[in-house]
Amino acid sequence: MKRSERIDRVELMRTFVRIVEAGSLSAAARQLSTTQATVSRRLQSLETMLGVRLILRTTHTTRLTDDGERCYQHARRVIDSWLALEDEVGQTEDEPVGVLRVRAPHAFGQDQLLKPVTEFLQRYPQLSIEWMLNDRSADFLGDNLDCAIRVGVEVDPATVSVLLAEVPRSVVASPALLARFPAVTTPEDLQQFPWIAISSFYQRHVELFHDASPATARIAITPRLSTDSLYVARNTALTGLGVAVVSSWTVQDDIQEGRLVHLLPEWQPAALPVHLVYPWSRYYPARLRRFLELMRQVMPEVTGMRKPV
C-alpha cells in the first residue's frame, strides 16, 4: 500500500507542476490527455494531503500562493529526480522511450529533416515524436515542448541553445521582373526594385557582405508583400512580384533552370544560424539527449546547410 501511495503522490506532483507550467487547469488537462475535472481533483488531493492552498483560482486566472510557489520548486526537483530514477532502474538511460515533443520551422520540418527523423524513430521503436511545425518562438511551458529547432539569431538566453549549422541565403528575382529595370551591377541598384520581405528576418533593410573583402552594404527596401513563410517568398518571387532574400536551398533548382536569377552572387546576406533550443533542467531524458546527438550529426549534412563558420 505504501508503494502505491508514493506513486500516487508523484502523479499528484506531476499534475501540479503541469498546471503551473501550462498556466491553467484546462491547458494542463490537454497536455496530460485527461479531463479538467481529473486535474482539479488531483490538485485538491495534493492540497488536502499538504494541508495548504497551493493555487488561488478565479474565473479568468490562476495564481500560486506562497506555499504553492515553495511546493512547485520542491515538486520540480522531485519530478526530475524521479524521472532520473526511472531511467536508471528501468535500464533505459541510453534507450529513448516515451514521447518527444519538437517544434521545427515549416520549411525544414516538412522537407529536409523528415528523413533523419524517420530513421531515428525506426532505430528506437519505443520512442514517439510529436513533430509540430511553426516558425514562431517556442513557448516551452505553455506548449509543453521538449525542444525546438530555431533558424535565426534570436535565441532566449534563459534556454540552452546548441548551434548546429547555418543556412546560406541568396538574393533572387525573376527574369520578367529584371527585364523592367536597369541592369543590377551594385548593391545600391537593388533599391529600385519592389521587394518581398520575410518578416522574421528582414522587413525594411537588407544587409549584404562582399565575399572577397570586408565591404558591406545596407539596402533600404520597399516590400510589396511581407510574409513569415519561406515558401511564400520563393513562390511570389517566381511570379515577378519582387526581389527576395531566401534560403539558397529553396531556389537552387529555380536558378539552374532559369526561373530565377541569383543577383550579385559576390554579395551575400549573412547565413542564418540553426540552433536546437530547450529549457534548462536538472535532468534531461534519454529521448532528448539522443535527439540532440542526432541533430548535431545530421544537421550540417542536410541539403542547404553547412557547418558553422
Which positions does each model-derived feature cover?
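C-terminal regulatory
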Residues: 138-142, 154-274, 301-309
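Short helix-boundary/capping micro-motifs
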Residues: 17-33
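Central regulatory/effector-binding core of bacterial HTH transcription factors
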Residues: 97-160, 308-309
